[in-house]
Amino acid sequence: MFAFLRGELVTASREEAVVEVSGIGYRLHISSGTSSRLPVPGSPVFLYTHYHVREDLQQLFGFLDEEELQLFRLLLSISGVGPKLAIAVLSGLSVGEIQEAIVSNRPETLFGISGVGRKTAARIILELRDKILKIQPTSSAKAGAPSAVLSATQLIDDAVAALTTLGFPKASAQKAVSKVLETTPGLSVEELVRTSLAAMHNNL
């Protein structure tokens, strides 16, 4: 419904901003990162927006750059992650830090954020890692470092790490991952973890 707002910044706090456009004031929820980069009240401002609607609530979220908006929407695509938690994640770390934690499979970086537990952190990495690799190559890849395509060893390590973070014993995780790769090679990390999870549940 709203792609962006261009107007005058009226007020701003760590969590909200009010922007006047043609005499109408729009209240937007923002991350602390966006808040820290806003101009002083009375200045012109341009914010990308996300309009979130549910049965009992309508909310408008504002972002200074498209990268933050894109990551916000990716976070919303995860089961159990709503806009409040997505903004908390963006407030806890920069976009680059979040992407690096996801690509490098470091859930401990994410569950240091208020409201993000171990299982949520693992789910974020599991569901977004391949998407982040496709849309946002790491700085090392941009600089001509080895391709982001994972080696077999790295693929296994990442899948096992995701499963152990979800609470499965390491030995069981390794066995399930290896068995899946024997029968279905060429999987991404996300696909490998999902297939291994299904196999482990079937054996319970």
Curated annotation (Swiss-Prot):
<dbReference type="InterPro" id="IPR010994">
    <property type="entry name" value="RuvA_2-like"/>
</dbReference>
<protein>
    <recommendedName>
        <fullName>Holliday junction branch migration complex subunit RuvA</fullName>
    </recommendedName>
</protein>
<feature type="region of interest" description="Domain I">
    <location>
        <begin position="1"/>
        <end position="64"/>
    </location>
</feature>
<keyword id="KW-0227">DNA damage</keyword>
<dbReference type="InterPro" id="IPR000085">
    <property type="entry name" value="RuvA"/>
</dbReference>
<keyword id="KW-0233">DNA recombination</keyword>
<comment type="function">
    <text>The RuvA-RuvB-RuvC complex processes Holliday junction (HJ) DNA during genetic recombination and DNA repair, while the RuvA-RuvB complex plays an important role in the rescue of blocked DNA replication forks via replication fork reversal (RFR). RuvA specifically binds to HJ cruciform DNA, conferring on it an open structure. The RuvB hexamer acts as an ATP-dependent pump, pulling dsDNA into and through the RuvAB complex. HJ branch migration allows RuvC to scan DNA until it finds its consensus sequence, where it cleaves and resolves the cruciform DNA.</text>
</comment>
<dbReference type="GO" id="GO:0000400">
    <property type="term" value="F:four-way junction DNA binding"/>
</dbReference>
<dbReference type="GO" id="GO:0009378">
    <property type="term" value="F:four-way junction helicase activity"/>
</dbReference>
<dbReference type="InterPro" id="IPR003583">
    <property type="entry name" value="Hlx-hairpin-Hlx_DNA-bd_motif"/>
</dbReference>
<dbReference type="GO" id="GO:0048476">
    <property type="term" value="C:Holliday junction resolvase complex"/>
</dbReference>
<feature type="region of interest" description="Flexible linker">
    <location>
        <begin position="144"/>
        <end position="151"/>
    </location>
</feature>
<dbReference type="GO" id="GO:0006310">
    <property type="term" value="P:DNA recombination"/>
</dbReference>
<dbReference type="InterPro" id="IPR011114">
    <property type="entry name" value="RuvA_C"/>
</dbReference>
<comment type="similarity">
    <text>Belongs to the RuvA family.</text>
</comment>
<dbReference type="GO" id="GO:0006281">
    <property type="term" value="P:DNA repair"/>
</dbReference>
<feature type="region of interest" description="Domain II">
    <location>
        <begin position="65"/>
        <end position="143"/>
    </location>
</feature>
<dbReference type="Pfam" id="PF14520">
    <property type="entry name" value="HHH_5"/>
</dbReference>
<dbReference type="GO" id="GO:0009379">
    <property type="term" value="C:Holliday junction helicase complex"/>
</dbReference>
<dbReference type="InterPro" id="IPR012340">
    <property type="entry name" value="NA-bd_OB-fold"/>
</dbReference>
<dbReference type="Pfam" id="PF07499">
    <property type="entry name" value="RuvA_C"/>
</dbReference>
<dbReference type="GO" id="GO:0005737">
    <property type="term" value="C:cytoplasm"/>
</dbReference>
<dbReference type="InterPro" id="IPR013849">
    <property type="entry name" value="DNA_helicase_Holl-junc_RuvA_I"/>
</dbReference>
<keyword id="KW-0238">DNA-binding</keyword>
<keyword id="KW-0963">Cytoplasm</keyword>
<dbReference type="Pfam" id="PF01330">
    <property type="entry name" value="RuvA_N"/>
</dbReference>
<comment type="subunit">
    <text>Homotetramer. Forms an RuvA(8)-RuvB(12)-Holliday junction (HJ) complex. HJ DNA is sandwiched between 2 RuvA tetramers; dsDNA enters through RuvA and exits via RuvB. An RuvB hexamer assembles on each DNA strand where it exits the tetramer. Each RuvB hexamer is contacted by two RuvA subunits (via domain III) on 2 adjacent RuvB subunits; this complex drives branch migration. In the full resolvosome a probable DNA-RuvA(4)-RuvB(12)-RuvC(2) complex forms which resolves the HJ.</text>
</comment>
<dbReference type="GO" id="GO:0005524">
    <property type="term" value="F:ATP binding"/>
</dbReference>
<feature type="region of interest" description="Domain III">
    <location>
        <begin position="151"/>
        <end position="204"/>
    </location>
</feature>
<dbReference type="InterPro" id="IPR036267">
    <property type="entry name" value="RuvA_C_sf"/>
</dbReference>
<keyword id="KW-0234">DNA repair</keyword>
